[in-house]
Amino acid sequence: MRHYEIVFMVHPDQSEQVPGMIERYTGVITEANGKIHRLEDWGRRQLAYPIQDLHKAHYVLMNVEAPAETIEELETAFRFNDAVLRNMVMRTKVAVTEASPMAKAKDERDSRRGPAGDRSYDEANAEEIAE
């Protein structure tokens, strides 16, 4: 089996259907005795240029190990799913399991926020003023 990196972009109005799509696509891979090494839901992001008059899309990244027939089946599913705006499947030499730069940047932002990151600006300032 070969290793692949798959990225697909979903119409922003269909974002609530993304978990079901991920489940369906991962099911296709695991049924063919494939493995999912990395799965990242990047969420809704700004596009570099408009696609079908849209400026945002929901991104999903998957690194998988699967037979070529399974990847062809996934590409066909992407092609016939109107919610999928774009997809890209690239063959890789080895399995990629570490977090992507997108996920690392998100983790860094979350860690910098610290414990006050969940509170509103007014709550954090109210505590500082009270002290």
UniProtKB/Swiss-Prot annotation:
Keyword check for RNA-binding: yes
GO terms of biological process kind: translation
CDD domains linked to this entry: bS6
Coiled coil: none
Keywords: Ribonucleoprotein, Ribosomal protein, RNA-binding, rRNA-binding
Entry GO CC: cytosolic small ribosomal subunit
Alphabetized InterPro entries for the sequence: Ribosomal_bS6 (IPR000529), Ribosomal_bS6_sf (IPR035980), Ribosomal_S6_plastid/chlpt (IPR020814), Transl_elong_EF1B/ribsomal_bS6 (IPR014717)
Region of interest: Disordered: 96-131
UniProt feature, compositional bias: Basic and acidic residues: 104-122
NCBIfam families reported for this sequence: S6 (TIGR00166)
UniProt protein name: Small ribosomal subunit protein bS6
